[in-house]
Amino acid sequence: MLLFKLIVCFFFIFAIGANENKKDETSGENEPSENADVNSEASVVKEAFKKPASRKVNVKPPAAKPPAASKITKPQVPPQKKPPAPKQTTTKKPLLANIEGKIKGAANETTKYLTNLAKEMGKEAESALKEKAKEALTGLLDKADINGAFNAIASIWKNNENKPARYWKCAVENLSEETLVALGTTPYSGNVKTVLSDIPPQSTGVFVWESDSALTGAAGVVHYQLGDKILNIMASDPYDWTLYGAWANVRVSDNKETFDNLYSGKNGAQYPTKAGNWGIADGVKFFLTNNKEAEFQVIFSG
């Protein structure tokens, strides 16, 4: 029995030794794999560390920076910085207003000055024209001269080729002691085309009445005032003598006479003369001196 126990112990010890050797061999064989595992794990770790770096590159610049742009778009200029401008304008307003007022005042004064100057020049030109026209149209102022009056009007009137189809010239002799003051005209067809001027005593005035066109006559009334009376001179150079024969009429009355009264002999006016016959009305002689030139003469004795 004892021997059997010894044999069993021997085999048990031998088995333990064999197992230890096997463990050593297996452990030696397994070491490279462990190292490989360690290396693989290290590469994995490296790859893991590399990936975040690549992510950093791929990641766009901080997208959270738009707030900075929004800060720029937001009113950076504080509204509090604008008050200085209103302060300057408020302080300069009175000065600017004064300057503008002075400029406007100067402009108004200049405009008034130029306007008055133009008026004065116009008055001077008008008065000079009237004086020249008066000298030409009244003929000789020292004595009544029909020929001188007609010559004067011919020198300033149109040339024969430019004369209208119908017209009449009238020379008015003032044999009274008072001036015949020109009061204007009452047109019927056409109008006076020359200056109608006053006629001093013992002087002769002359004017020309023209038609408006070749298809109308020259007809109307010219008025002169002498004291409280009015000398009304009517003449009509008709477009067609066969249809309209009345030519001239004169009347001294208290008012301006109409063309119809003098042409038709109404309301106290006598019937007009025809074809240059002599006529006397209220002490005034009137007649056609030249039918071809339509020269009409009025002699006013007062």
Curated annotation (Swiss-Prot):
Keywords, in A-Z order: Cytolysis, Membrane, Nematocyst, Secreted, Signal, Target cell membrane, Target membrane, Toxin, Transmembrane
GO BP terms in the entry: cytolysis in another organism; monoatomic cation transport; pore complex assembly
Biased amino acid composition, Pro residues: 76-86
Record flagged with keyword Transmembrane: yes
Location within or outside the cell: Nematocyst; Secreted; Target cell membrane
Keyword Glycoprotein set for record: no
GO CC annotations, alphabetized: extracellular region; nematocyst; other organism cell membrane; pore complex
Region spans: Disordered: 22-93
UniProt-listed InterPro entries: Actinoporin_PFT, Anemon_actinoporin-like, Cytolysin/lectin
Gene Ontology molecular function: any one: toxin activity
Gene3D superfamilies: Cytolysin/lectin
Renumbered ranges of motif Cell attachment site: 274-276
Compositionally biased tracts (Low complexity): 60-75
Leader sequence residues: 1-17
Domain of life: Eukaryota
UniProt cross-references to PANTHER family, sorted A to Z: BRYOPORIN
Function: Pore-forming protein that forms hydrophilic pores and causes cytolysis. Compared to equinatoxin-2 (AC P61914), it reveals lower cytolysis activity (5-12-fold difference, tested on erythrocytes), a larger pore size (probably 2-3 nm) and different affinity to membrane lipids (100-fold lower affinity to sphingomyelin). Binds to sulfatides. Shows cytolytic activity on HeLa cells, with a different potency than its paralogs (from most potent to less potent: HALT-4>HALT-6~HALT-1>HALT-3>HALT-7>HALT-2).
Family as reported in the entry's similarity comment: Belongs to the actinoporin family. HALT subfamily.
Assembly information from the UniProt record: Octamer or nonamer in membranes. Monomer in the soluble state. In vitro, interacts with folate receptor alpha (of target organism).
Free-text domain note: Composed of a long N-terminal alpha-helix and a core region rich in beta-sheet structures. Before the pore formation, the alpha-helix binds the lipid membrane, partitions into the lipid-water interface and stabilizes the monomeric molecule on the membrane. Finally, it traverses the bilayer, thus forming the transmembrane pore.
Protein name per the record: Hydra actinoporin-like toxin 4
Organism phylogeny: Eukaryota, Metazoa, Cnidaria, Hydrozoa, Hydroidolina
